């Protein structure tokens, strides 16, 4: 039973007093009698009836109801929702306005047809979706479970919908939890159960849940009838990682409740026979349903622009109606005396005044011209976007075979935003890297152990990369980077040395096997778990073992170790137990290894602490060495393993070795003690090899495997103890008192244990070096011990810098020994924090900070996180596409910088500005210094101070194209502390301006809040389109802030995916998603929206021009049936198909020419001037389509509809031909829809004209179309008018493609010229690799040859014309697949460097060229040809002549004249390109022609 705590009444009106809602809720058992009931049986029966009626405790029951409508509420509720869209309100208003007799233009019922049709389609879709939800709800609500019945005194089967808060539920293995349940009993002897949360967050690794304190010690089975405790917990919320509360027993004692005690709805019980719990939250109050908010809705940039243009159309509609109203009023005033000839007077003989007639005319024109607002545009956009999402999901190139996952489109309405991204913000760990940690190096007590053998072993797992073999020796690398540690400096560093490759290039089979296993365990491949020990460290471990073996029967065992050996011992103990790793068996992957020792439970109260740590208990409570040895022999690990075969077919059986073989150990010259324990290890090797570790963090698994390599083996973890297997000492069981988990603020985790050898309370801490080094106990320089500790810390810090410089992730390991008094004092405050319901997180945080102080440094580790496949190539392609990439990581600065070099985010020959500051004043000074340096290098001036906004010089959305004096823009590296200062209000403008001038930005040690603040800053200040990509929970905030959020389903769960708009398996798929699908989606939608605006404007223009011939009386010459259904039926399907299937550029051209992506960034397809040009063209076409039929039928005896029907026919044909001009890729569906539209129009017209004999007397459309089909003038007019109307657009498109083409038009021209030969030219600037000669056959099986037209003059720039010759395969190229790179050069072997400046491409000429001939064009701010490759020679244009020969020849002449002008104007600017002669190649290894924003010619 649950009751709300009484709250104070708030003042209010009489009769409407309301209580302030409390922050907690009280839950009681439903089996208890209600308060005030005298008869328990009667009270119980009453409570049972209340529960069955679904009103128990007046709270929501467990019934799931996701439907929005009922049979009675569907129509009004759905209409109410649809009328929230302004367009629907507008069209309904117009339809209702048509019911006014004085202003109606159409039949009232007919005017409602379009809007009713749109509303009906939307309503039917909503009804179907709601019905699907109803079926799903019914299925879930009628699932069964066991609920305890008071009347029957046993568990009975009931439906999920019959469960209420306060019920006791019993779940068996593999059953799904029906509600949020507090765990009170488990069949596990340790009070544990394992759950799978895949249905909740997508994570397949099992999680442990613990029985509430006080119930796990019960010997007998839990009886719900005896449960009388009261539960106080927090209100329902959607935080899956948080649950706070307490349970109050009859004796008044409280026990804290945490998320480990809560079983969430939707999770599945695994590896536990049965559990019992009480329902805390039911139905829609459960955390799962509170998190189920449905698909995210965002409004795309194109949609926002479209809404603005719709407003312009509304304004244009008002202006046209107002113009007609004024014209009609003036016309009435002028012909006042002749009004009786054309106006029917009223019954009293009076007539309308000019003003009144003008007002009526205004309203009537609003109705007539309503088509100007595209009624079907929004529905068409939804259909096109749904189809785009479908095709993206069906792209097999976005499927990852290794992880068996594919791209997911979670946001259905921002697909076009993928084609307009300007800034990418990326996490590092798990996004650019694999997040599969491999132990590489460590330092203990100031001594470094390089693990060279382990490095050599890892090298065998990756292929040799010839381009990255030149590595500077480690010492030089360290010395050069030694200055990185300064915290208040700004440096411009020229990177000269190479970095070690971090790319994993092992076999695909191994990678696939490892990824399959990674779904269930943290690390499973041999590369990641088989650690080769360092001989020196192994010798230290052996020496430590000898000392412990000699003193094994003495009391103070660890006191016999030297300080160095003691640190070694504690170092590996900390690696083993300072984590949350769960031990499992491969035979039963979901079965925890249990070797239970009879130890006392964890400390939960002060009384328990006093009893536990009295002197008598300290001597008798700990296990002796002899007993530990006995435990080792009596509790064989193999006996605890089930003998049943594995039921998980997806998991592979892994054989894990325990350390080195005995022969290898003996060969190192170890003592006989080492031989003895080595022989013992060999005996238990078969059982120990069956261990498997499941870790929530990859770092933890790597460290546990590293400790295992040194024979410190984690064999068991329970909620109150951790067992470790050691040589000679056997199995040590550490009592686990507390676990202080990792969080992004503390950046560390700690465990509090009682040591079995000393009975001391130890705190082991591991975390980031930036925080742990500051928590160490102060050292005195007076005594020798203090000086020694300072020396150790200094050495450790130097080694940490070495590890970070090599790209390794660093962690520091520390320890603290607590006295009894210190622990008692801390425990009291910690228990108070645990039992607090308000500010519990803050209190626990402060409690952890008080404990993690005065630490003793043990050592540090370096873990390698390898780059994902294809990351450098993807970053290079994205940069060529004009995208600026920022990496926001929480890693150490040196580590992040090294990874940035490895993934080509930073280049070795570029300048790097490193910004580290210790205060806000220092950060401001450093920013000013950086800005001065930027100005001195020839970049833009510093921003001026503005109010609330960045300077106007920030108006450019794309990254600046200006470069430094050395030709490259610098990169910026900033640490987390400096970033916090830079994000302050008074410094953010300077920081943003500096970052905008940099080629790359790397933010290190950044928190999740800082990540989101950086994204928000760029998005709001620069008005740029942003994309954030990450894989972990710490990336959720920036993913949600960005315009487009992309999540990666990696090692850290599915939180990022659940918060994202799109989910990709790996980072490399971002290239295809943006450059290909993003460009296509934007281009299709932009052109479709423009076409809808054009089509409606052109059709409205026909009606508007007619007003000049009818006195602006709002009359129409087109039948109202055509007016109503023309845009809705006859002309809506072809643009829809084009919007779904059109491809302006083939896939291979886009992928090999990322520069084409810039068209979307610059909004070339849809910008304001394009919109108004389109509207002007529509007005011209409407004038032509009106004038020619008017002249053709002038002075004829045809009636109004006979003249209007050819106009409608001409409009339809003009629309389709216009669409044909704008369509880039024609498919059979395009032809079918166009033919269907024409056929449908004539069919409807013939049927309608034949059946409508007396529709609109006296002028009726009877037999109109039949008569026109027999008139030659009709055919002549329908043929001539569309050609005349479209001639200017056709001429402009042809002229534009030949004189001033855009990059996209050039790419399309090459594709249209020869699909078989277009791939080679466009790939000459794709990736910058050169072959040995032009006749070399590549992996694709094609050979590229070069040639030039024979008619080309020798003085003209040589243009390559390529052809593909395939041996044994078809001659055509599959345009749906990316084409491999081919080159057009001969006789070259050295690769030519690529141009990295934005807007530049590389052209390699096949002809001879002087040494180092380069022409760099200045940016003009306008998108122009990629290179001279696309500007064809003068006479080669004759080959492009299409059916419109006059236009093509005129374009050729203009191109010839323009070429000569350019050649004359640039005489002497660039080096001439020599004419082609035979097979002569270039005379050097690096001959290229750089063509920028403007196309230049060299003589």
Swiss-Prot record:
It catalyses: ATP + H2O + phospholipidSide 1 = ADP + phosphate + phospholipidSide 2; a 1,2-diacyl-sn-glycero-3-phosphocholine(out) + ATP + H2O = a 1,2-diacyl-sn-glycero-3-phosphocholine(in) + ADP + phosphate + H(+); a beta-D-glucosyl-(1<->1')-N-acylsphing-4-enine(out) + ATP + H2O = a beta-D-glucosyl-(1<->1')-N-acylsphing-4-enine(in) + ADP + phosphate + H(+). Residues 477-499, 1341-1356 have a biased composition (Polar residues). Its EC number is 7.6.2.1. It is found in: Cell membrane; Endoplasmic reticulum membrane. Residues 1330-1340 have a biased composition (Basic and acidic residues). CDD domains: P-type_ATPase_APLT_Dnf-like. Mg(2+) binds at residues 427, 429, 1031, 1035. PANTHER family: PHOSPHOLIPID-TRANSPORTING ATPASE VA (PTHR24092:SF81), PROBABLE PHOSPHOLIPID-TRANSPORTING ATPASE (PTHR24092). This is Phospholipid-transporting ATPase VA. It comes from Homo sapiens.
């Amino acid at each position: 039973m649950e009751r709300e705590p009484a709250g104070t009444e708030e003042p209010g009106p009489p009769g409407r007093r309301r209580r302030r809602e409390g922050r907690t809720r009280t839950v009681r058992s439903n089996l208890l009698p209600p308060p005030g009931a005298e008869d328990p049986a009667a009270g119980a029966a009453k409570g049972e009836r209340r529960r069955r009626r679904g009103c128990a405790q007046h709270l929501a029951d467990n019934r799931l109801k996701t439907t929005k409508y009922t049979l009675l509420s569907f129509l009004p509720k759905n209409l109410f929702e649809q009328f929230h869209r302004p367009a629907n309100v507008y069209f309904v208003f117009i339809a209702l306005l048509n019911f006014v007799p004085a202003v109606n233009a159409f039949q009232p019922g007919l005017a409602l047809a379009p809007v009713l049709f749109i509303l009906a389609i939307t309503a039917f879709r909503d009804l179907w979706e709601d019905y699907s939800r109803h079926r799903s709800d019914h299925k879930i609500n009628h699932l069964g479970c066991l609920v305890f019945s008071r009347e029957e005194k046993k568990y009975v089967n009931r439906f999920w919908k019959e469960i209420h808060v306060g019920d006791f539920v019993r779940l068996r293995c593999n059953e799904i939890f029906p509600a949020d349940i507090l765990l009170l009993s488990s069949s596990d002897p340790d009070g544990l159960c394992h759950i799978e949360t895949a249905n909740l967050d997508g994570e397949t690794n099992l999680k442990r849940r613990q029985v509430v304190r006080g119930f796990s010690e019960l010997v007998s089975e839990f009886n719900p009838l005896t449960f009388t405790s009261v539960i106080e917990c927090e209100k329902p919320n959607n935080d899956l990682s948080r649950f706070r509360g307490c349970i109050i027993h009859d004796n008044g004692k409280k026990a804290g409740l945490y998320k480990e005690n809560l079983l969430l709805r939707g999770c599945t019980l695994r590896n536990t026979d049965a559990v019992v719990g009480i329902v805390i939250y039911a139905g829609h109050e459960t955390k799962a349903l509170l998190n189920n908010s449905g698909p995210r809705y965002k409004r795309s940039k194109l949609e926002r622009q479209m809404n603005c243009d719709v407003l312009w159309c509304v304004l244009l509609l008002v202006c046209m109606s107002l113009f007609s109203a004024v014209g009609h009023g003036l016309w009435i005033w002028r012909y006042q005396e002749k009004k009786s000839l054309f106006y029917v007077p009223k019954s009293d003989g009076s007539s309308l005044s000019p003003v009144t007639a003008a007002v009526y005319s205004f309203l009537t024109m609003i109705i007539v011209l309503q088509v100007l607002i595209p009624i079907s545009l929004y529905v068409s956009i939804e259909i096109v976007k749904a189809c785009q999402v479908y095709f993206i999901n069906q792209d097999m190139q976005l499927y990852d075979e290794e992880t068996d996952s594919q791209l997911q489109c979670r946001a259905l309405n921002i697909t076009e935003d993928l084609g307009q991204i300007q800034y990418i913000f990326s996490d590092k760990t798990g996004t650019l890297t694999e997040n599969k940690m491999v132990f590489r190096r460590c330092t203990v007590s100031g001594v470094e152990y390089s693990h060279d053998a382990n490095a050599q072993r890892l090298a065998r797992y990756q292929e040799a990369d010839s381009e990255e073999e030149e590595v500077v020796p480690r010492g030089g690398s360290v010395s050069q980077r030694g200055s990185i540690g300064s915290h208040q400096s700004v440096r411009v560093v020229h990177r000269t040395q190479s970095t070690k490759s971090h790319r994993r290039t092992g076999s695909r089979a191994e990678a696939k096997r490892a990824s399959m296993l990674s779904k269930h365990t943290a690390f499973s491949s041999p590369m990641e778990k088989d650690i080769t020990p360092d001989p020196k460290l192994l010798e230290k471990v052996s020496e430590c073992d000898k000392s412990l073996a000699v003193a094994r029967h003495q009391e103070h065992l660890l006191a016999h170790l030297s300080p160095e050996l003691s640190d070694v011992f504690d170092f590996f103990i900390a690696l083993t137990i300072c984590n949350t790793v769960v031990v499992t068996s491969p035979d039963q992957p979901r079965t925890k290894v249990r070797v239970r020792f009879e130890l006392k439970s964890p400390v939960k109260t002060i009384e328990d602490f006093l009893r536990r740590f009295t002197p008598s208990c300290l001597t008798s409570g700990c296990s002796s060495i002899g007993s530990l040895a006995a435990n080792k022999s009596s509790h064989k690990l193999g006996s605890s393993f089930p003998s049943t075969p594995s039921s998980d077919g997806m998991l592979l059986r892994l054989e894990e070795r325990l350390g080195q073989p005995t022969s290898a150990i003996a060969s190192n010259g170890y003592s006989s003690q080492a031989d003895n324990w080595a022989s013992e290890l060999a005996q238990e090797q078969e059982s120990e090899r069956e261990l498997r570790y499941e870790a929530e963090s990859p770092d933890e698994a790597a460290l546990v495997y590293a400790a295992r390599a040194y024979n410190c083996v984690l064999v068991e973890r329970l909620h109150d103890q951790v067992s470790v297997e050691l040589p000679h000492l056997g199995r040590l069981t550490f009592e686990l008192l507390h676990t202080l988990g990792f969080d992004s603020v503390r950046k560390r985790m700690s465990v509090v244990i009682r040591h079995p050898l000393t009975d001391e309370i130890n705190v082991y801490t591991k975390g980031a070096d930036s925080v742990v080094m500051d928590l160490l106990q102060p050292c005195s320089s007076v005594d020798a011990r203090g000086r020694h500790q300072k020396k150790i810390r200094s050495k450790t810090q130097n080694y940490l810098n070495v590890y970070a410089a090599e790209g390794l992730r660093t962690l520091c390991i520390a320890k603290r020994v607590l006295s009894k008094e210190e622990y008692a004092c801390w425990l009291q405050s910690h228990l108070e924090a645990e039992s607090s319901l308000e500010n519990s997180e803050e209190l626990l945080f402060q409690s952890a900070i008080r404990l993690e102080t005065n630490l003793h440094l043990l050592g540090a580790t370096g873990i390698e996180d390898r780059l994902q496949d294809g990351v450098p190539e993807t970053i290079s392609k994205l940069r060529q596409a004009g995208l600026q990439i920022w990496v926001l990581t929480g890693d150490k600065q040196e580590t992040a910088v090294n990874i940035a070099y490895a993934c080509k985010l930073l280049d070795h020959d570029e300048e790097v500005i490193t910004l580290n500051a210790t205060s806000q004043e220092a950060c401001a000074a450093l920013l000013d210094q950086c800005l001065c340096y930027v100005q001195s290098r020839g970049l833009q001036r510093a921003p001026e101070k503005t109010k609330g906004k960045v300077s106007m010089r920030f108006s450019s959305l794309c990254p600046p194209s200006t470069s430094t004096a050395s030709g490259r823009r610098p990169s910026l590296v900033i640490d987390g502390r400096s970033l916090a200062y830079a994000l302050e209000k008074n410094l953010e403008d300077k920081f943003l301006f500096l970052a905008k001038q940099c080629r790359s930005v790397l933010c290190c040690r950044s928190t999740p809040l800082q990540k989101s603040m950086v994204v928000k800053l760029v998005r709001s200040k620069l008005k740029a389109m942003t994309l954030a990509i990450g894989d972990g929970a710490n990336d959720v905030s920036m993913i949600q802030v960005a315009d487009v959020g992309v999540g990666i389903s990696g090692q850290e769960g599915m939180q990022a995916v659940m918060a994202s708009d799109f989910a990709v398996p790996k980072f490399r798929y971002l290239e295809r998603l943006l450059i290909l699908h993003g460009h296509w989606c934007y281009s299709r939608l932009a052109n479709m929206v423009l076409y809808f605006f054009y089509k409606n404007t052109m059709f409205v223009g026909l009606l508007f021009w007619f007003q000049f011939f009818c006195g602006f009386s709002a009359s129409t010459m087109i039948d109202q049936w055509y007016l109503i259904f023309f845009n809705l039926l006859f002309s809506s399907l072809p643009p829809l198909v084009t919007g779904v299937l059109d491809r302006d550029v083939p896939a291979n051209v886009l992928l090999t020419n990322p520069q084409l992506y810039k068209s979307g960034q610059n909004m070339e397809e849809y910008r304001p001037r394009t919109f108004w040009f389109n509207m002007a063209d529509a007005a011209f076409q409407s004038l032509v389509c009106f004038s020619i039929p008017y002249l053709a039928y002038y002075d004829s005896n045809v009636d109004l509809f006979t003249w209007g029907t050819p106009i409608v026919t001409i409009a339809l044909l003009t629309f389709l031909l216009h669409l044909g001009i704008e369509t880039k890729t024609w498919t059979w569906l395009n032809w079918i829809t166009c033919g269907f539209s024409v056929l449908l129009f004539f069919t409807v017209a013939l049927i309608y004209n034949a059946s409508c004999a007396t529709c609109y007397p006296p002028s009726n459309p009877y037999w109109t179309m039949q008569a026109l089909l027999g008139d030659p003038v009709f055919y002549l007019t329908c043929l001539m008018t569309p050609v005349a109307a479209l001639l200017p657009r056709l001429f402009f498109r042809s002229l534009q493609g030949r004189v001033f083409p855009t990059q996209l038009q050039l790419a399309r021209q090459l594709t249209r010229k020869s699909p078989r030969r277009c791939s080679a030219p466009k790939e000459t600037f794709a990736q910058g690799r050169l072959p040995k000669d032009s006749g070399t056959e590549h992996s694709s099986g094609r050979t590229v040859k070069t040639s030039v037209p024979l008619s080309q003059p020798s003085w003209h720039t040589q243009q390559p014309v390529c052809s593909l010759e395939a041996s044994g395969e078809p001659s055509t190229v599959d345009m749906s697949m990316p084409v491999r790179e081919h080159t057009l050069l001969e006789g070259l072997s050295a690769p030519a460097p690529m141009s990295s400046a934005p807007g530049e491409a590389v052209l390699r000429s096949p002809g001879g060229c002087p040494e180092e001939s380069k022409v760099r064009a200045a940016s003009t701010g306008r998108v122009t040809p990629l290179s001279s490759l696309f500007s064809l020679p003068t006479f080669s244009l004759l080959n492009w002549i299409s059916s419109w020969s006059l236009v093509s020849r005129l374009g050729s002449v203009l191109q010839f004249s323009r070429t000569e002008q350019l050649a004359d104007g640039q005489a002497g600017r660039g080096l001439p390109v020599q004419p082609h002669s035979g097979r002569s190649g270039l005379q050097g290894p690096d001959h290229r022609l750089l063509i920028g924003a403007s196309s230049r010619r060299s003589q």
